[in-house]
Amino acid sequence: MEVHRMRLLVLTTVIVALNLGLANAQSIINDPEADTGVLRPDFSANRGPMVAIDSGHNNYHTIDHNFGPFASLLRNDGFRVVDTKALFTGDSLSPYKVLVISNALPAALVNDWKLPASSAFSAAEIDVIKAWVMGGGSLLLIADHRPLAGSARDLALAFGFRWEDGVVARDPMDGRRDIFTRADATLLDDVVTRGRDAGTVITSLRTFGGSGFRAPPDARPLIVFPTGFMNHECGLPCPADALESDATGYLQGAVMPFGKGRVAVFGEAAMFSAQVWTTLKPPFRFGFQAKGAEQNKQFILNLMQWLAGILPER
């Protein structure tokens, strides 16, 4: 029990440091020193497909808060990136090619993550998003640990993805970073990881805690948890008596064609941006500028090009 308690304590400390925590929400910010340059932009400036980043559902990650470097990277590749605070309707989604939703929450959970998870989206909004993707739109849906995964679960389920509302992590006593590679078959071969040429092939990715899910048969796994990862049935802080189960084979990233559109689902948000925890001395930086995440930037560009229809479906 004492070993288990120590592991959970370390787990909580590590994941809060790397990603989310209500008490630290204001001290984790967009990294102003992040390198968001693109050597070979795919589009002329502001001439690419339009990407909307949701901020209308109490999102933890928005352009202004923690996803600024993500938006800057896309703009430097030529994408037209906008913030959207609107409820999802056919009219509100019609201008966009790609919709990005990261870590949405219902109003009841904004200030109390201990409450039971509930959907961040109404049933009507979920139906609208599903129809929009079926008609040719593309969705990037991202949700971290409990209750964020639980708040995205109904939307994910509309596309056949089944989220575990917990925290998936390696035993923190192990000490290794969460790095997924082609060499160990935790990062899989796909058009997204192959990119458009030899210079955009992805062989390694780093993530920072997060959640796991099961995917429908038509989905293509990209990031797969190997032996040694556990799903902890808790939010943060994680209590010592939290139940845990083997997460081997669960996914942290997958893509899928859906009707005329495309869907990408990921159980971790920090990998897509560059953030800094300002109250630590020295400030702690994590995201695509962290050690071991050197290929994350190119992966983001590959993924967005796939969602925008620039890369082939397969």
Model-derived features with residue positions:
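Bacterial N-terminal signal peptides that target proteins for export
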Residues: 1-10
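Short, surface-exposed patches at the edges or C-terminal ends of soluble domains, predominantly
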Residues: 24-314
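Bacterial N-terminal signal peptides
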Residues: 10-19
